[in-house]
Regions:
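Active-site loop-to-helix "anion-binding N-cap" substructures in soluble metabolic enzymes
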Residues: 1-222, 226-229
Length: 229
């Protein structure tokens, strides 16, 4: 079967089985074309909770499907590839979290949404990259243990100097390989492009970015027609 034929079959079965298809923005074009909703992990889970469909197919990784199920407990949630995992979400296990909590007993544990459901059960609050600063600013406790991404955690800490942060030594393997030298090369190659950076990148990269707002939102906010991401 061709890609187009497979897509048509997916659309037919989707309607027949009363499911909606959620696709993370990182998915390939052939997946995005059959999806009902495209976005980030939390945004997709919210869309699933609002959907009238009885089931959801999450085209993403395991923690995304888990988050979807948490927000839509009455819906059936399928993960097309059960082996699809997020290295950052899986680098800290429950035993490791309990060890950290023992080291920082007076700290409020803030978990990035990119964590397993198992870890979420023993954390105090869960945040997204766009909500982390606001939520942490309203915590009564000034001591915050941020897991699992130290880069996002440090970005939040810089916005909230009145808080005392501790971090887990983790990070996204894809984002941490981007260096300041890579950024300078991109700027040299595309001098008229605005630089958009995700806060999971290293501090040296975040500091020289044009924007760290949600990437898709940034392309709408700024008038530029060229972006380096």
């Amino acid at each position: 079967m061709t890609i187009a034929e497979i897509q048509q079959e997916i659309l037919r079965m989707k309607k027949e089985q009363d499911v909606c298809i959620l696709a993370h923005a990182y998915q390939g074009q052939e997946i995005l074309e059959v999806a009902d909703y495209m976005g980030d992990s939390y945004g997709l889970s919210v869309q699933a909770s609002k959907s009238k469909c009885s089931g959801v197919i999450m085209c993403g990784v395991r923690f995304m499907a888990e988050t979807c199920k948490i927000l839509s407990p009455d819906k059936k949630v399928w993960l097309p590839n059960p082996a699809a995992g997020c290295p950052m979400a899986e680098q800290l296990d429950l035993e490791g979290l309990r060890t950290l909590k023992a080291e920082y007993p007076d700290y409020t544990v803030v978990a990035y949404i990119n964590t397993t459901s198992e870890l979420k059960t023993e954390c105090d609050v869960c945040v997204t990259s766009s909500s982390a600063v606001e939520i942490c600013s309203h915590l009564e406790n000034d001591k915050i243990l941020f897991i699992p991404d130290p880069n996002l955690g440090r970005y939040v800490a810089e916005q909230l100097p009145e808080k005392n942060f501790a971090f887990y030594k983790g990070g996204c393997p894809r984002h941490i390989v981007v260096s300041a030298k890579d950024v300078e090369k991109a700027r040299a190659d595309h001098p008229d492009a605005l630089l958009l950076v995700h806060p999971e990148c290293r501090q040296e990269v975040v500091e020289i970015s044009t924007s760290i707002s949600p990437l898709i939102k940034s392309t709408i906010i700024f008038s530029s027609s060229r972006f380096s991401i």
